[in-house]
């Protein structure tokens, strides 16, 4: 099996199949069009430029196209980039399929869904439990398949479920240490906080924002979904309002996308847990691509910092 694109070092030549994750047209300083291609396999993704792009190239090299590329790994502005020597679409007779290039969560789907189901089962507040179970059942298929984002963290197949399960385990540890926390509320907030992304995002392959995602966003979407669930289940209680508040405030600040700051204890903890798991995922994925004694590529969402892998971390 060919070495993953993110495992190649600067200066190495590559000759392998990759999947086009996204394709964006630009105009160079000489006035000629080019395409910025994000190419991916199971190890991650890398940017490449297709210079002097023709109009037909925009169709030929669109998202979800498998291509055979030959090129060299370069380092540019803190990140590796693939300098193309040759690129062509893969033929129908070439034994490659899209699934071969998709990064997936490290835990099987059924195990993640079992874990979420168990946390819901442990809830003692019937109103919180019923709303959470209702929404997970309603969007279960998408929940287990979708990424958690288009970029930055958990942006892979089943990334949303993996993010939630990791956060649930964190929430359990925090609640064990601080028993004054309402476990049911915290667990429900974790499970539901990003569930609106199943409407905000297009799906697990070549993920983009939907019209609803661009115009409303996952926070507004889920606040509405909670209200609908409560109405369908004939639940008229304060739990509905507090669950909606947890969703509205989980980004922490207006400049980070939350209309309201956390004003309930469990909302504050949800924000911390979400932030911690996202950042650890970003660091882990960057660090696993470098050797001990090396620095990672710059991680834009972490203040554009590089991270060092200590030599003793063999």
Swiss-Prot record:
It holds the Pfam family HD. Signal peptide: none annotated. It is an enzyme of class 3 (hydrolase). Disulfide bonds: none annotated. Its EC number is 3.1.-.-. Residues 14-90 bind DNA. GO terms for molecular function: 3'-5'-RNA exonuclease activity; DNA binding. Gene3D superfamilies: Hypothetical protein af1432, Nucleic acid-binding proteins. GO terms for biological process: rRNA 3'-end processing. Residues 163-279 form the HD domain. Keywords: DNA-binding, Exonuclease, Hydrolase, Nuclease. SMART domains: HDc (SM00471). The keyword Electron transport does not apply. Belongs to the YhaM family. Shows a 3'-5' exoribonuclease activity. NCBIfam families: PRK13480.1 (NF010007). This is 3'-5' exoribonuclease YhaM. It comes from Bacillus licheniformis (strain ATCC 14580 / DSM 13 / JCM 2505 / CCUG 7422 / NBRC 12200 / NCIMB 9375 / NCTC 10341 / NRRL NRS-1264 / Gibson 46). The gene is yhaM.
